[in-house]
Amino acid sequence: MTQLTHINTAGEAHMVDVSAKNETAREARAEAFVDMQAATLAMIIDGSHHKGDVFATARIAGIQAAKKTWELIPLCHPLLLTKVEVKLEAQPEHNRVRIETCCRLTGKTGVEMEALTAASVAALTIYDMCKAVQKDMIIGPVRLLTKSGGKSGDFKVDI
């Protein structure tokens, strides 16, 4: 079994030292879902929400969140992201919104947490903007879809 990298030999949490690692191209993709009533989703699709464009706001929130992941997750490194993409897709057949994020960089550590944070905060933003209309929306699942680059190799979720 792989060891936890953020725990030292004394069992204490610490930030991993990546100074000796080589810089490599890295990418991670994540997804999140927000389930809601058909009427709430229709309001988003029609652009009739009184707070404005829900998708545009969620997209910007996701991008901002990826850039601030190191401030939110205690042991994450600050990263020089070269790409953050947040795609939002209304899925009326399932009464939900699907969010897919992609983060890239060339660096010494991966971008999985940035992709997951972007997806999570975009979902939370949709909830925040729509909670006046519907409070029982469900966020989830949130998961890593793929990651590439780095010492641990590539990962792709089984669909």
Swiss-Prot record:
Top-level taxon of origin: Bacteria
Native species: Yersinia pseudotuberculosis serotype O:3 (strain YPIII)
KW Transferase (keyword) present: no
The reaction(s) this protein catalyses: (8S)-3',8-cyclo-7,8-dihydroguanosine 5'-triphosphate = cyclic pyranopterin phosphate + diphosphate
Transmembrane spans: none
Gene assigned in the entry: moaC
Binding site for substrate: 75-77, 113-114
Protein family: Belongs to the MoaC family.
Active site, per annotation: 128
Pathway involvement of the protein, from the record: Cofactor biosynthesis; molybdopterin biosynthesis
Function, in words: Catalyzes the conversion of (8S)-3',8-cyclo-7,8-dihydroguanosine 5'-triphosphate to cyclic pyranopterin monophosphate (cPMP).
Protein name: Cyclic pyranopterin monophosphate synthase
Lineage: Bacteria, Pseudomonadati, Pseudomonadota, Gammaproteobacteria, Enterobacterales
Keyword Cell membrane recorded: no
GO biological-process terms attached to the record: Mo-molybdopterin cofactor biosynthetic process
GO molecular function: cyclic pyranopterin monophosphate synthase activity
Quaternary structure (record): Homohexamer; trimer of dimers.
Annotated disulfide bonds: none
Assigned keywords, A-Z: Lyase, Molybdenum cofactor biosynthesis
Name of one Pfam family that matches: MoaC
E.C. designation(s): 4.6.1.17
NCBIfam families (UniProt xref): moaC (TIGR00581), PRK09364.1 (NF006870)
UniProt-listed InterPro entries: MoaC, MoaC_bact/euk, MoaC_sf, MoCo_biosynth_MoaA/MoaC, Mopterin_CF_biosynth-C_dom
